[in-house]
Amino acid sequence: MRLKNKKIIVTAAAQGIGKATALAFAKEGAIVFATDINEEKLIELKKANSNIEIFKLDSTNKSDVSNYCSSIEDIDVLFHAVGFVHHGNIMDCDSNEFQRSVNVNIYSAFLMTQ
């Protein structure tokens, strides 16, 4: 059990890869801090494994990320699963959607890593 008692933050943990990863880390004995913007699905995740700590977090919000991460001492691992994809032709992507993509895919990774 190499992950036993390791403190791991998993972003986008409410569904998909983030959820599967959070559950797998918890099963291996890690202390998992699961974040997502979808609080309802985070609550479902907590019901699946009571050892997972959940927190509603917009990982593109600098002050929220800073406050949250500073509340956890000695983080061992960050598993950043947040992602946003524009589906369709790039010519149909407006500047707001492009900015959202940059914020979610790049800026949030920068904030969480700091």
Give short role names for the model-derived ranges.
Residues 113-114:
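A short, exposed helix-loop element centered on a Lys and neighboring polar residues
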Residues 89-90, 97-99:
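Substrate-binding pocket helix/loop in short-chain dehydrogenase/reductase
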Residues 82-87:
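Conserved NAD(P)H cofactor-binding loop of Rossmann-fold oxidoreductase domains
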Residues 49-62:
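Rossmann-fold cofactor-recognition segment
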Residues 14-15:
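Conserved glycine-rich cofactor-binding loop
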Residues 1-9:
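Flexible N-terminal pre-Rossmann segment of NAD(P)-dependent oxidoreductases
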Residues 28-42:
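Conserved glycine-rich Rossmann-like NAD(P)H-binding loop of the short-chain dehydrogenase/reductase
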